[in-house]
């Protein structure tokens, strides 16, 4: 199982939000490139980069920083989300060497977009489904849609996406533990990989996710916990790789 460190970018800095609220942020570093290098040195095989400003603006705002991280960390996979709502943005990131682009809001608001971009950019499209109580949130989590998370995941699987990143937004940034039941339910409902996100706080969460690897969970994204020290990244990675 992959353990994927999250680097959330706001105004060129590495931050974490609580439950997606832009006004409730904690700045962890003014140098996201150095942060990325730290996680790679600790053994990370993939990085999860989020352009938070882009997620709210609807277009990239931290692309320069993302490109710099790609150049500084050439030997790991990079997945990028936040503000990816057109083919031009996807092409730009792929040209810069990004491995996977994550589509969130646009996948929900314009479902045909997913089938178009999976055809145009096969093997590079991941869908980020952020949900509260089984319903999908959009626009940087500021709106809750009527869409059921499993129904949408099954549709995107049929469209040919690479994987689903599932975030339980009631848990994200709250250090409350991962929602194993909801993650397992989604993973069992589809045949493409699921990456868990939101609430991964301690080594116990890695153990719990390891028990549902057989359901189709291939990785876990962790953010606040590795910055605040409730999860030692190297220790968590070592455990994750046993699953």
From Swiss-Prot:
Q: What is its EC class? A: isomerase
Record localization: Cytoplasm
One Pfam family in the UniProt entry: His_biosynth
Q: Per the record, GO CC terms? A: cytoplasm
Which keywords does this chain's UniProt record carry? Amino-acid biosynthesis, Cytoplasm, Histidine biosynthesis, Isomerase
- Per the database entry, which stretches of residues form a coiled coil? none
User: GO terms for molecular function, please?
Assistant: 1-(5-phosphoribosyl)-5-[(5-phosphoribosylamino)methylideneamino]imidazole-4-carboxamide isomerase activity
Which positions are catalytic residues?
8, 130
Which biological process terms from the Gene Ontology are attached to this UniProt entry? Answer: L-histidine biosynthetic process; L-tryptophan biosynthetic process
EC code(s) of this entry = 5.3.1.16
Q: What is the top-level taxon of the source organism?
A: Bacteria
InterPro entries per the UniProt record, alphabetical: Aldolase_TIM, His_biosynth, HisA_bact_arch, Isoase_HisA-like, Isoase_HisA-like_bact, RibuloseP-bd_barrel
The keyword Lipid biosynthesis belongs to this UniProt entry's keyword annotation: no
**Disulphide-bonded residues:** none
Q: Which reaction does it catalyse?
A: 1-(5-phospho-beta-D-ribosyl)-5-[(5-phospho-beta-D-ribosylamino)methylideneamino]imidazole-4-carboxamide = 5-[(5-phospho-1-deoxy-D-ribulos-1-ylimino)methylamino]-1-(5-phospho-beta-D-ribosyl)imidazole-4-carboxamide
Q: In which pathway does it act?
A: Amino-acid biosynthesis; L-histidine biosynthesis; L-histidine from 5-phospho-alpha-D-ribose 1-diphosphate: step 4/9
HAMAP family tied to this protein: HisA (MF_01014)
The text of the family note is: Belongs to the HisA/HisF family.
Protein's name in the database: 1-(5-phosphoribosyl)-5-[(5-phosphoribosylamino)methylideneamino] imidazole-4-carboxamide isomerase
What organism is recorded for this protein?
Methylococcus capsulatus (strain ATCC 33009 / NCIMB 11132 / Bath)
């Amino acid at each position: 199982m992959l353990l994927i460190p999250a680097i959330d970018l706001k105004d060129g800095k590495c931050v974490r939000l609580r439950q997606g609220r832009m006004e409730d942020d904690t700045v962890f570093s003014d140098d996201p490139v150095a942060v990325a290098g730290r996680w790679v040195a600790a053994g990370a095989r993939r990085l999860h980069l989020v352009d938070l400003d882009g997620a709210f603006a609807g277009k990239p705002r931290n692309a320069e920083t993302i490109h710099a991280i790609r150049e500084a960390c050439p030997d790991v996979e990079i997945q990028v989300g936040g503000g990816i709502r057109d083919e031009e943005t996807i092409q730009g990131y792929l040209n810069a060497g990004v491995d996977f682009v994550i589509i969130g809001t646009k996948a929900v608001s314009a479902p045909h977009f997913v089938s178009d971009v999976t055809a145009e950019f096969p093997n590079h499209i991941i869908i980020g489904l952020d949900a509260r109580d089984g319903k999908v949130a959009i626009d940087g989590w500021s709106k809750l849609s009527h869409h059921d998370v499993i129904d949408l995941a099954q549709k995107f699987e049929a469209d040919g996406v690479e994987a689903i990143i599932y975030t339980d937004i009631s848990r994200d940034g709250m250090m409350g533990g991962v929602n194993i039941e909801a993650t397992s339910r989604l993973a069992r409902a589809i045949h493409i990989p699921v990456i868990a996100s939101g609430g991964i706080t301690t080594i116990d969460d890695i153990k719990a996710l390891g028990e549902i690897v057989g359901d189709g969970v291939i990785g876990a994204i962790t953010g606040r916990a590795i910055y605040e020290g409730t999860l030692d990244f190297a220790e968590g990675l070592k455990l994750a790789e046993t699953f």
